[in-house]
Amino acid sequence: MFTLKKPLLVLLFLGTVSLSLCEQERAADDDEGEVIEEEVKRGFMDTAKNVAKNVAVTLIDKLRCKVTGGC
């Protein structure tokens, strides 16, 4: 019976350490995911702003051409 306890304790210890390492890696991956989502949101908002600016500039140029008649 004593000869079986040591290997079982070693397996339990190694399993606990392995589980602990997996949880740390999973937590680190979750943190990186949040950063990536923020970057994607920020990138989308920047793109939307740039599109809005380009549309506004184009409309202003067309209005200026119609008002002055010199395009």
Swiss-Prot record:
Keyword flag Cell membrane: no
Annotated keywords: Amphibian defense peptide, Antibiotic, Antimicrobial, Antioxidant, Cleavage on pair of basic residues, Cytolysis, Disulfide bond, Hemolysis, Secreted, Signal
Pfam families referenced in this protein's UniProt entry, alphabetically: Antimicrobial_2, FSAP_sig_propep
Subcellular location: Secreted
Propeptide: 23-40
Highest rank taxon of the organism: Eukaryota
Role: Displays broad-spectrum antibacterial activity against a range of Gram-positive and Gram-negative bacteria. Has low hemolytic activity, low cytotoxicity and low antioxidant activity.
Family: Belongs to the frog skin active peptide (FSAP) family. Brevinin subfamily.
Protein name per UniProt: Palustrin-2AJ1
Organism: Amolops jingdongensis (Chinese torrent frog)
